[in-house]
């Protein structure tokens, strides 16, 4: 990383208050759903891999080894599967936004990064996908610059 990039990062961070947080990751979650904008994609379900990371606005030292004190990823998987099976979705971007909305259902989640990839569409030649990084509306943690 160049010194100029580091200086920009430091400059951006100095005005933002530091609050304790930790991150939860869910990786390699594969769901089968009806997705795709093209007619030939509507005829059969496709496998999609979802990876996500949530920044949790909570001091991990205050959790006290209690499941009730943390954001549960178990229920999160069930909610994502329900959305995926509820209807046809045209775009990966739409699915990623809906996954982010599910994550923001817990008030402690302040930022979500979601990657969604179609696993079977190009016969193994390539894996198309998108990455979405979004902050909770009104959060002090602004979304990154693209």
Features from the language model and the residues they span:
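N-terminal, polar/charged subdomain of small-to-medium soluble alpha/beta proteins
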Residues: 2-146
């Amino acid at each position: 990383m160049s010194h100029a990039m580091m200086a920009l990062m430091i400059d951006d961070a100095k005005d933002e208050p530091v609050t304790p947080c930790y991150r939860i990751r869910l990786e390699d979650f594969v769901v089968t759903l009806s997705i795709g904008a093209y007619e030939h994609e509507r005829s059969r379900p496709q496998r999609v891999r979802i990876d996500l990371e949530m920044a949790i606005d909570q001091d991990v030292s205050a959790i006290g080894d209690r499941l009730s004190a943390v954001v549960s990823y178990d229920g999160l998987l069930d909610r994502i599967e329900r959305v995926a099976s509820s209807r046809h979705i045209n775009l990966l971007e739409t699915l990623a936004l809906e996954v982010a909305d599910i994550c923001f259902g817990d008030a402690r989640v302040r930022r979500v990064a979601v990657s969604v990839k179609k696993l079977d569409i190009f016969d193994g030649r390539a894996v198309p996908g998108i990455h979405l990084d979004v902050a909770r509306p009104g959060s002090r943690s602004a979304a990154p610059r693209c």
